[in-house]
Each structure stands twice: as structure tokens, then as C-alpha cells.
Amino acid sequence: MNTTNAKKKGLSTETLVLSALMTSLVIVFQCLATYTTFFGPFSTAIGLIPIVIGAVLCGPVIGAWLGLVFGLVVMITGGANLFFAFNIIGTIITVVVKGSACGLVAGYVNQLLQKFNRTVAVIAAAIVCPIVNTGIFLLGCILFFMPYANEIANLLQLNVSGMAVFAALAFGNFLFEIGMNIVLSPIMVKIIEVAEKTFNRKGKKMAHAAQPVEAEAENSEENN
């Protein structure tokens, strides 16, 4: 095992640990969100916070995974029950795709911008995440639920029709979520900086500890 392989193994372990931690936080945060139904029948997506942090620290793929977990938690905790009553398949597709996509896009936005400025990259990822989440929700409503718009409006006692029904459902939560992410962005930056420094130190220690082992292995090969 050479130094490069050891380093790659260390980074892989770090990513695994961080993704497991962020997965746990997504589950906890979104379960807590069940009790934060401020606007309409939906809970607020506070699970987007660890999704952004995970996407920045671990990359777009882990961001997509965290978004998938977020979507599953939303469905399990009853956050999509209103739509399940009208179109089960459409609900599953919409919830899973919007969750995965918001984490994936947040990760790519961070990768694109971090070469210029880390703080700007994190803030941009935090803003893009709820935009993608809400945008795909509205797209899913158009594709799968437009025939039921008036029925949903009557059920929720909304004095609107057509696409305005779904816009009304999403608008309040969207403003809350994007505002929350913007306000918490500086905290996210600090958390990310601390996490990176911590794992960088551990990575250096692992690489340093591996050097004597590698030297001993090389000497053994030479003697043989």
C-alpha cells in the first residue's frame, strides 16, 4: 500500500463518516419538521440544512443521497399524504426527484463557485437548494395533479383554481425555507470550515502513521 492509496482510503472513510452523520441529521431534522406546519398542510423542509452541508462537504452524489433520504422521510412521516390520496405514483416520483435533485444541484453549485470564493459558494448552494426543491414540486404538480387542482382547493378551502392552488401551497413554505437558509448560511460556512479542518488533521495523522509501515514493507520486499 503506497501513500496515495492510504490517502484515498482516508478520504473515503471521512466521506463515509460525514455522509452517515448528515443522513442522521436529515432524518432528525425532518422528523422534527412534522411539528412545524406553519403554512398550509405541509411541514417546513428544515431537512434541507444538513443536505446543503453534506453536499458541500461530500459532493453532489452524497447531496443527492441526502435529498433522497429527505424525500423518504417526508413520505414516511405523512408529509405527502394529501397528494397520495390523488396519485400515488406521481407523489412518489415528485417527492423523490425533488429531494434528490436539490441535493445534487447544491453540490454542483458549490463545486462550480468554491474555486472563486468558499463563502459565496456555500450561500449559493443554500439558496439553490430550496429553489430546486420547490421548483420540481410545482413541476410535479403540473404533470401529475392538475386534473385534481380544484378538488384539492375545495378540500383545503382555498379560493383559487388551477396552478394557483399549488403556488399557494408552496409559496409560504418556500419563503420560510429560503429565508432560513440565507440566515443560517454563515453558520453553515463555519460548520463546514471546522469539519474540513478536523478531517484534514486526521488525514495528515493517518498519512504520517502509514509511512513507517510502508517503509518496513519496502525493506521486507528488498530483503526477500
What do the PLM-derived regions correspond to, one by one?
Residues 26-30, 70, 74, 102, ...:
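Alpha-helical transmembrane segments of multipass membrane proteins
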Residues 29-30, 34, 106, 110, ...:
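Membrane-water interface at transmembrane helix exits
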Residues 132-157:
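Juxtamembrane non-transmembrane "cap" segments at the membrane-aqueous interface
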Residues 1-65:
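Hydrophobic transmembrane alpha-helices
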Residues 16-20, 49, 63-68, 92-97, ...:
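Hydrophobic alpha-helical transmembrane segments
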Residues 1-23, 156-224:
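Alpha-helical transmembrane segments and their cytosolic interface
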Residues 30-44, 68-104, 108:
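Interfacial aromatic-anchored transmembrane helix boundaries in multi-pass membrane proteins
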Residues 112-135, 202-224:
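Internal alpha-helical transmembrane segments of multi-pass membrane proteins
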